[in-house]
Every structure is written in structure tokens, then in C-alpha cells.
């Protein structure tokens, strides 16, 4: 069976928390799954993302903060940070979607004050992953 046109709610597409948009469900608007630490998503080409996250990690660690990175299986060994966690493989976005909640909770368990995360392509499942991540990060995004 084929569905007709699918419309995405404006609360999901918004890149800011807009008080004028009424959320139909808690995960559509608010800092859903948000870790206690300040989370920032870094977007761009892989090499630049890795370089920027490593720079940010060094900066925050030198200031004495607890820092963590949310990476993928493909890149996790390339980060120079005390706490690097893989959320899954880019080859199977389902593994990322399935592991996202647990990895965000783990950030609280390790006491991460600053969390830097890779971004994901916003195609089918990637759009849902990024929606949750953007809300968890309160829309803190760096483009490199």
C-alpha cells in the first residue's frame, strides 16, 4: 500500500524552540533526551568536523572540564578526548537511532560537562536522528 504525501510538522522542522508552535508530543519541541552537560553538534565535512571537535576538546580539557565526544564507529578512534563513545555505524543508521537515547544517558553517568557530537545526513532516518540530537543540544550547532 502506498501512502499519499507526508507532511512534517513545523515543530519538527524548526531549528529553534519557538514558543508560538504548539508541540503535539513532548519530543517534538522541548529538550527531549537532553543530557545535563552542554551539548554541541558539529556539522561539515568529516575531516573538518574531527579537527574542530578535537580543538574544542583540548580547549575545554585545558580549562579543567569533563568533556565527551559522541562519534560513530567509523571515526571514534580519531578523537583525542578522554571520553569518546560510539553511537553506532553510519552504514546502519538504525544502529544510531537505537543507540541515541542510551548514549545521551551515558553522558550524564560519566559526568560530561561539555559534549561534542558529529552530525548526520538529514535523509530519511537521519532526519529523525538529527531532530532528536538538535533538541538534546538545544540547537547548539557549529558549522565547519
What are these regions (language model features)?
Residues 1-10:
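A conserved active-site cap/scaffold subdomain adjacent to cofactor or substrate pockets
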Residues 141-144:
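Short, flexible loop segments at boundaries between secondary-structure elements
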Residues 21-138:
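A C-terminal functional module that forms or caps the active site or interfaces directly
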Amino acid at each position: 500500500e502506498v501512502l499519499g504525501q507526508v507532511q512534517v510538522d513545523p515543530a519538527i522542522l524548526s531549528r529553534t524552540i519557538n514558543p508560538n508552535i504548539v508541540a503535539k508530543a513532548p519530543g517534538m519541541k522541548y529538550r527531549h533526551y537532553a543530557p545535563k552537560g552542554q551539548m554541541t553538534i558539529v556539522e561539515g565535512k568529516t575531516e573538518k568536523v574531527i579537527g574542530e571537535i578535537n580543538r574544542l576538546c583540548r580547549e575545554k580539557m585545558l580549562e579543567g572540564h569533563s568533556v565527551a565526544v559522541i562519534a560513530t564507529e567509523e571515526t571514534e578512534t580519531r578523537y583525542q578526548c578522554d571520553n569518546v563513545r560510539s553511537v553506532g555505524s553510519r552504514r546502519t543508521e538504525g544502529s544510531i537511532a537505537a543507540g541515541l537515547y542510551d548514549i545521551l544517558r551515558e553522558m550524564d553517568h560519566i559526568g560530561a560537562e561539555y559534549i561534542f557530537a558529529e552530525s548526520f545526513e538529514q535523509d530519511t532516518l537521519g532526519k529523525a536522528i538529527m531532530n532528536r540530537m538538535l533538541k538534546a543540544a538545544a540547537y547548539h550547532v557549529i558549522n565547519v
